[in-house]
Amino acid sequence: MKQIEQLIEISRKYGQDSRFVIAGGGNTSYKDDERLWVKASGHALATITEDGFAVLDREKMNIISTKQYSTNSSEREAEATEDLMAACITKGRKPSVEASLHNAMSAPFIVHLHPTLINGLMSSVDVEAQTSRLFGDEVLYVPYSDPGYALYMKVSQAIAQYVANKGHEPQVILLQNHGIFVGADTIQEIEAIYDRVLSTIEHAISAPLPEGEAEISDLVSEVVPAIRMMVSRDGESRTLKVQNSQLIEWFAQSQEHFDKVSGPFSPDSGIYCNSKYIYISADSVDAILSEAEQKIEEYKSSNGYDPKVILIKGIGLVCVGRNAKECGIVEDVYLDMMKIAWYAQSFGGEHPMTPEQRLFVDNWEAHRPKFKTAGNGRVENKIFIVTGAAQGFGEGIAKCLIREGANIVVADLNEERGGITTAELNRMASGNKAIFAKCNITDPESIKALIKSTVCAFGGLDVFVSNAGIARAGDLETMSIENFELMTKINYNAYFLCTKAASRVMKLQNRYNAENWGDIIQINSKSGLRGSKANFAYAGSKFGGIGLTQSFALELAPYRIKVNSICPGNFYDGPLWSDPVNGLFVQYLNAGKVPGAKSVEDVKEYYLSQSPMRKGCAPADVCKAVLYLIEQTCETGQALPITGGQTMLN
């Protein structure tokens, strides 16, 4: 059907433009005399297909306008929703809660959005006078109404009055603290109307938005992990995201500026970000933590739930979510609120929703987003850093963990390969997420930046997997001092540097949550359990790693941080062994490590014969060990072999 194709076209056009759609807000429709196609709940405008539209019987919908409902607002909304669902022909698709508003306008195509610029006007003190000044009687302005049935009836009555006065319906309806409806015969007309409305408002803005990023203070690593624990004391870990910009910095610089964004401007902002937010003005670590703990406890006590938005002077915007996806939505919506507040200054100042209006939205079940709270992954919402995760064992471990609900930081020097791996991980993720962080694990400053990136992306650190390592085979005659020192630096020294940095975050978290545990897991080797001929430099670095593991475990146990090593057998399919130029099969052949071996296949057969199970070790095997070590709370300082029986502990 041509009209539905056009509806999809215009839906995607605006849905993919963040100036018009934030967090999936807004909806579109097409109607003929008998039926209405309207965006179904749970479908994004940006990617919508024909299956994303609910189809309704307009005759049955019209009953809603004349039927008498309960005077109790909750009961009334439930009754009206029931009638709306009864009109739905496509029973598997729930129509938008605003479907009745689309039906109230007679134009075939309707596009309802919440554009930032328009809501700067709609959420201003002088909204009615300024709307009249800018548009005259070209548009229909409707003062705020609670969403749902009440809004539908108010708009219907306003349309009827407009028709009585003007002799025709309005093409544009502007809703206070809500957004805009545009109706027309064609999608081209709708596009032209939107362009005209936005251009008119844009020319009335007296000061442009502050542009550009702003630095996030290094204090973030000493503050935000503790705040994460303050909002995670119910046994379910939260994800936090930290962002800063010139715009955020302006609103965070004082209580006066924060007050301009201290309440929601629309139902959506109240739904996604809650109706109240926290501002912290302290400027030292101890003072910030003290103020945060006090205000978060007060917030929970008075509201019955955790805050989703915390603005910290000198640090930036901290968003709280049940997973990384929700955190990103909270960030998008609150940043949009900041822009709305800024634009509103051109129209007399900001006008947030009243306490009574917020209360209705807080209790409005019909439109509350059904976020996935907790998945069934074994490490759901835990935060991992995996070094050397761009490829090989690290990549395999990261892929296993992302399937189990983990948030992953791919820490590696290889930016190109790391970016590819991170993209693959995110395609596998659901509510969780992966990011790439370029890191040189032998450089303390690079590790410090890695920790900061992790805290900003996810709010803290639960598990550090020290996986990055190198192997250079050689006997006493052929091993160079340069190769020996390089292996020691990467396989041994870096483990110390990473543990030092990671344990600081874990100590801080556990100080604020008595039930929390942290894990540091070194991916060692079977060569860390027994000597390796013509491979002493590698084996020595791995033996030393187990010594560090045991010593770190003794030191960190009082802080509820477990430290363990995993000693995998040979990962024959990975680049460490199978690289045709520098792989260990080639190195061992050239070093004469396997007596009588004349080819790479001879070397491989020799190593397979060393394992009773005649198999190499795969990342999935190692990941099972990682999960075991995390889930248990009775072992630390251990070296767990995963070798198919090749190495057996005494």
Language-model regions: role of each:
Residues 615-642:
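C-terminal substrate-recognition "lid" of short-chain dehydrogenase/reductases
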Residues 475-476, 480-485, 607:
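Substrate-binding pocket helix/loop in short-chain dehydrogenase/reductase
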Residues 504, 554-555:
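Alpha-helical segment proximal to the catalytic Tyr-Lys
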Residues 1-384, 396:
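Glycine-rich flexible loops
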Residues 479, 531-539, 551:
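Active-site loop-to-helix junction immediately N-terminal to the catalytic Tyr of the SDR YXXXK motif
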Residues 525:
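Residue(s) in the substrate-gating loop at a strand-loop-helix junction
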Residues 499, 541, 549:
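Active-site helix of classical SDR
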